[in-house]
Amino acid sequence: PLGIDPRSCDTGNVIIIAGELKMVSQTVRHQGARLIIASTRRLAADQLDSRIKSLNYLNQIMARIEANEAGADEAVVLNQAGFVAEGTADNIFIVKGGILLTPPVTDCALDGITRNIILDIADKLSIPAEEKSITPFDVFTADECFLTGTGAELIPVREVVGRHIRQA
């Protein structure tokens, strides 16, 4: 019914959606992004494993709408337990007390390519790094914060919900 029964698919289909790719502005790259904490939550891992790229971006779209309406550049999406999961299309890192922190995949963070590169570089440079559950308060009180993504690369964060991030 409704075309969602996989047994009714005799052959595979390829769908390509092409549109203008809008990258992060140079202003945001130089001045830093302004973030909000979205009220829209990330689906729980037992509902939709964050490692599955299913193109089901409804929660991220809803969070992005919240960011747009708030005049922010991006939204931080929390998981069902209230821990930081990720941005709408990027991973989040904070630096606190000299330690680089990012949410673990078990907190519904995307196991992103750029995220893993950052963790590998930190390891090679002997920079203390941990995958650890992060609260919104941890982000508010971070010494530094940045976002990563394949298209976004690395984006500094200057404020979260109007609170300025201290720069080390």
Say what each PLM segment does:
Residues 2-168:
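Helix-start/capping segments and mature chain N-termini
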